Amino acid sequence: MKRLLVFATVVALTLVASGLLLAQSNPNVGTWKLNPSKSKSSSAGLILRSGTRTVTAQGDGAKYSYEGIAADGSHVGYSFTTNYDGKYSAASGVGMPGGADTYAVKRVDPSTFVGTGKKAGKMVGTNTTVISKDGKVATITGKGTDEQGKPTSTTTVWGKQ
């Protein structure tokens, strides 16, 4: 019984330590607040009034969750999980850019991530996230189409909390 308890404790500590190491090696992990005054878009209404971006280490990748208030006052809340392997996974919620229903992310280098969204199998957008050297700012530049098929471009700036 004592051996089983020691074994279970070692396994639990190993899992916690590996999760902490992954979080430390991924500067994207954390909670980020949108800075609307430093953000811009090609058309009115694409930048949120306020927003929180939470990236949580999960396995070899991360879970991304977004919550905020759109320019028109409506609620935005969506999430997706990625293994940073470029494979698409389901996105759920409301307000996903371009109305994407699947999303994929690849890690280009330690501080750069490229994501692509598809709706019904058709590409609707791509974005690049770059984390600053000090790890305090994430700048996301995106290009795509809105739900009416019009081209869009955005740059959003997020501060780490």
Residue spans of the language-model regions?
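Positively charged n-region of N-terminal signal peptides that target proteins for export
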Residues: 1-6
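Short helix-onset patch at the extreme N-terminus, typifying the N->h transition
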Residues: 7-8, 32
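Bacterial N-terminal signal peptides
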Residues: 8-19
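Hydrophobic small-molecule pocket/channel-lining residues, especially in calycin-type beta-barrels
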Residues: 22-161
